[in-house]
Structures are given as structure tokens and as C-alpha cells.
């Protein structure tokens, strides 16, 4: 089986016609059997997709045919299975939600730092290194000596900056995230708040893992990704984590041995937060997922449509058999 290409991409660029771009972009994804989600907003494009080498190439070629996206930033990795179930293009106010409209990376942001130069920057004792990702992402991997802002969502990051960072005290700040988009917007926020020397890792963690040899790496752990792989290791291969269906938090094999873990229903992160009604709903979904798997289908996405069609056909056939049987007994 040929490997699936997983492509994370983004670009901050003014797209005044972003609403009109949606359907042609979705059509291109479907035509080339590329799955995943792309976000469009006035400020740009962001998302992660997956497909065959030919399919992803066709999508990138389509995007680059628009002069505004000719130099779109993207990172690739590979997986044995399709990590997404559907093809989606969504319209948003922001391609990454900070919640402050006046922050515009198209106007001002920090200085890009190439992966090969990143170690030198973060080894400088005068550099404050800040991980702009969420707490559950940082928990499974981050750079050595990086500060964890302990945020649950990116919207909380401005509050962290206001309470913990001072442009007069913190003269040199380096920031990073998974693919580069959050740290780029974060540096725009920092510049707006008066910080002068602000740097961000070009291409994010994924580009760093791709370009920096393991023996030179300052990365510790695995990198959380927003698809069914859950995390990738330094070789950009699927890591050792799974994901709780209920709360979407990453979990280890050891976590699965805990009494709070019930496959598809709860884990130690959410056991006391999930209602009985939710648990019952999750249990039914898990049951349907197992039945679908036994038939060689996925319970979600395009396979779900095929499964629903098959179930409908089987019900119709059963009704027809019952009708004929009843007729023969008359």
C-alpha cells in the first residue's frame, strides 16, 4: 500500500473573496480524493489535508495558481492510513482564533528563524522561550527549557502575556507552535504590546523535526497533531499516543489501564466531567463503530454514507423477503 501524504499548510494573506473561494476549493479536494479540513478567512488560509502524492500535488498546484497563495507555507509527513474521514472547507472570522480583531500578521509580526538556526537562539541565556500551544499538547512534548503558558485554548494566550511577560524585562522572546501559524499570530500580538525582539520558528515544530537531525535536536517527547495519528515522533511517524473519543485528550497505553478509561466513552481526563447521558451516547457510538469495522467500514465520513446505504438496502431486502413470504402463505 502506498503511503498517504499528510500536508499541513497556512498563509496569512488578505483574501477578500474568501467566501467565493470555498466551493471551487472543496470541489478540487473531492475531485482528487484529498481529505481533511481547510479554513478560509479574510486573513488567509489554514488547515491539514491528506491524500495520495498525486492528489496532494494537484491541490497544491490549484492553490498556487492563485498568485496570493503562490508561496503558501506547507509541511509534509507520511502515514500508512488516511487520518481524516471527510473533505471540508470552512469559512471563519480567523484562520486561528486569538479573538483580537486588530492583530494582523499581514501587517507586522516577529522575525522568522530557520530550523537550522533555532538551537542557537534558544540556547542564548537572554532568550525567553515560550510554547504557544495548549497545555494538553505541551504535556506530550516540547523544547528543552520552554515555558508552558498552561492555556486550554489559544484565546487565553493574550491574558497569559499580559500577566506574565513584560517588554521592559523580557527583551528577547522566541515562540513556537506545531506548524508556525499560532506563533506567527502570537508574535504579531507581542509586537502590538511593545515587545521589540520577537522571534518565531519558521515552519513550526514539524519543520524542525524534518530538518534537524535527532542527535542535534533540542526537542523532547512527541509532537501532538490534529488528526487520527494524535502525535508524531522525531521521524514524523505516528507516535505512541492514542486519543480519548470523549474529550480528545492524548492518552498512553498506561492511561488505558486506569479504571476511569472505557474505550470510546471516558478517560482519566474527563471521567468526572462526562454526564451519564453523554456516556450512554458514546457507548452507542462505540457499538456502531465496532459493527461498522466488522463490515469493513468506518463509522464516520464517506464510509458512514456507504454503510447507511448498505443498511437501507438490507432493510429493503428484508422487507421484500417478508412481503413475498406473507404473500405465499395466503
Curated annotation (Swiss-Prot):
Q: Which residues form the Rhodanese domain?
A: 123-217
User: Is tRNA processing a UniProt keyword of this protein?
Assistant: yes
EC supergroup of this enzyme: oxidoreductase
Keyword check for Oxidoreductase, yes or no: yes
One short Pfam name that applies is Rhodanese
Which keywords, in A-to-Z order, does the entry hold? Answer: Oxidoreductase, tRNA processing
Catalysed reaction per UniProt? uridine(34) in tRNA + AH2 + O2 = 5-hydroxyuridine(34) in tRNA + A + H2O
Which CDD domains did the record assign?
A: RHOD_YceA
Q: EC number(s) for this protein?
A: 1.14.-.-
* Biased composition range(s): Basic and acidic residues: 317-330
Q: Name one GO biological process term.
A: tRNA modification
Question: Which residues does the Swiss-Prot or TrEMBL record annotate as the active site?
Answer: 177 (cysteine persulfide intermediate)
Annotated stretches, region: Disordered: 310-330
- What Gene Ontology molecular function terms does this protein carry? oxidoreductase activity, acting on paired donors, with incorporation or reduction of molecular oxygen
Q: What does this protein do?
A: Catalyzes oxygen-dependent 5-hydroxyuridine (ho5U) modification at position 34 in tRNAs.
So what family is this one in?
Answer: Belongs to the TrhO family.
Name listed for the protein in its UniProt record:
tRNA uridine(34) hydroxylase
Q: Which organism is it from?
A: Francisella philomiragia subsp. philomiragia (strain ATCC 25017 / CCUG 19701 / FSC 153 / O#319-036)
